[in-house]
């Protein structure tokens, strides 16, 4: 770790710190890519990991004899050195392991200590599902926060952010650390309080939008570290309107999804603009779009959600717009407007990309299967979809700030991540984020059995086959989880199961308020659960009594995802 980052970590308690954005050319990226593997071999990081964990094991007898107050004092004395990966790290790991055992009743495995050391070093850890990532993140957060560093634990949804913050709170409290969580719907004051805690659990989307709000509050020119430090000296801390304390240390769960799959997704902060009074314009755009012919007037690439007018389509559109004024008078205006209308009609589908409720169109996050409250599509697309669905038109939004996950997470002074599926994107993660991936061996060998893929002729046959397979597993005493890719698909399968008189529960964007209850029961013997991506990454399903003996949880996937991960 560079001297600059060490210095920044020392200042972390007082200033809104973040790493300056890097501007790299192709040659810079090539040099880093070519030298990354060599650097990793020279550092012999894996040997150091094994030595740290072995030394932590050797400390167990001494540490277990310590009183609670002695544990606390020992960690605070060792934390700063542990953050720098100094000789204090093994003792610090042993201290937190003992505290977790005393306060949570969970004694971290060697594999979890190994992963915690990987994260503390600012690397990507590939840790298999079921190995205890939640506790691992908490161990790392304890070590970093004990040195005064503001820690963000980034999870994939609100449910996990709140659950893990509350579940790990006794461990943090043992060391005098405070914890907060950020979920959708919190007020600015609630967010400010949560970010002021030693450790903050939050989702990637909530975190980035709060950062953008701070950027808008600071102003277009931003604020230098010296300016923010001056505010601190004057008693203003971060300033009255700022939410975060800076971007010091992040632990990103399911990091490949956030850092790679969603890397270039633009996150746009906007404010309400003028009300929409001319609904007839949107209806006319939809009417004209419906008269255009696929293939001859426009071409669609559904997999990439792309659509463009052909030369013939532009001519047809000009003919259909003849005699109309306003936006229809110019070729550029009418072509952009009708292209958006075509996207609304053919690329965005109800119960797949959005949900209609209470006279509003709610966007469904394609990665998590959850509703994104208050989010809208831009450039008139949202209003066109509202018009298509017969909803009242919302106001135009004016863009205030935007950023991608890739640009945002590169601004952390120290970034780390965990996932069970990092191997195939390890080179890209190293190139873009300078994160070297380390595979953490499982505590016990996996007992998962992968069955062959079955292909059916049509949807109806597929749903019947799913019902039959679920019935077979249920008869054996196993709980069954059926994964679907969309809200619509989950409800189609639910209808088939109901016709077959098979009791089941459905977890999708309509039933998101019942998530905790559904997940808690999904591992019980004889339970059948149909779920969208909401029960995907980061979801822990605990097996009920007798389930392991019956074969464990039986998972049925009904569609392949875009990525094998």
Listing of model-derived features with the role each one plays in the protein:
Residues 1-565:
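Conserved P-loop NTPase motor core
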